[in-house]
């Protein structure tokens, strides 16, 4: 029977662990029209922003979120928008609200979402 050196076994074991870690690492994936456009490692507190045109108000909205790995979802941290209306936050108890130029800004919102659908 042939004996293999320990360094060969360690190399094989290391390669297996590296491959498994790629497949077992949680990822944050963004898809547009069924195509994957972004995929990054999903780590706690990973910040990201979503910029879109509000469907009712037809004005720009910027939302700042982070990954919440304890609850397996997302926290909405702040939002910035140009007009008041349906679907936009306005209650003072929901965060720190201020007007800045043409924009309304809500900070420290800490709203939790299990999933995000941008359709």
What are these regions (language model features)?
Residues 73-119:
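An exposed acidic His-Trp-rich patch
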Residues 16-18, 36-38, 63-64, 90-94:
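Intrinsically disordered, low-complexity boundary segments flanking structured domains
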Residues 26-32:
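A short beta-strand micro-motif
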Residues 32-81:
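N-terminal secretory signal peptides
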Residues 7-25:
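Hydrophobic membrane-insertion alpha-helices, especially the h-region
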Residues 15-17, 51-54, 82-84, 116:
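Intrinsically disordered, low-complexity segments enriched in polar/charged residues with Gly/Pro
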Residues 1-6:
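Positively charged n-region of N-terminal signal peptides that target proteins for export
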């Amino acid at each position: 029977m042939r004996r293999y050196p320990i360094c060969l076994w360690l190399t094989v074991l290391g390669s297996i662990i590296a491959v498994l870690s790629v497949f077992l690492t949680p990822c944050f994936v963004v898809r547009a029209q069924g195509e994957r456009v972004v995929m990054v490692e999903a780590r706690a507190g990973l910040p990201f922003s979503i910029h879109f045109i509000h469907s009712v108000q037809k004005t720009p909205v910027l939302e700042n979120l982070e990954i919440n790995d304890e609850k397996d979802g997302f926290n909405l941290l702040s939002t910035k928008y140009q007009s008041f209306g349906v679907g936009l936050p306005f209650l003072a108890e929901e965060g720190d609200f201020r007007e800045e130029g043409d924009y309304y800004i809500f900070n420290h919102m800490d709203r939790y979402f299990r999933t995000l659908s941008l359709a």
